[in-house]
Amino acid sequence: CCLEIGSAIGYSAMMLVSNINNFKVETIELNEERYLEAVKNIEENNLKSQIIIHHGDALSFDLEHLKIKKYDCLFIDAAKAQYQKFFEKYMPLVADEGICIVDNLDFHGMIFDIDNIKNRNTKQLVKKIKRFKDWIFDNELYDVEYHHVGDGICVIRKRVAQ
């Protein structure tokens, strides 16, 4: 099972359950319009039995509302400035042998050239993404693999005591 933070229109969740046998995804989406579109897409593709979708803010979401209590995977693709908060809240729900995937860590390549970003808000956002990247790579509790795929992805595993 996978917990996804940031459903958007449900595409990632639908791809996961369509390509992995007997897989379930539980997902949280803040934006009502995207949530409703995701519900529609999930229903039209007959995937309601495999995808549980919640509407709400993942940062204030009551964990008691989650139907699944332990996950094999956490997929974070929501508000980029909140990545560390999402990670800290939801990573404890991932099984010891599970993974966390964090998407869009290059932020259109801007992460590599922060000083040349003119827009103040964009610069602040990119700095927060960079702080998360630095924090997770320096965190001794996790093993982190970075992949230059798409807009940059990290695969994070809990470090196993030797």
Label the model's feature ranges:
Residues 1-162:
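S-adenosylmethionine/decaboxylated-SAM
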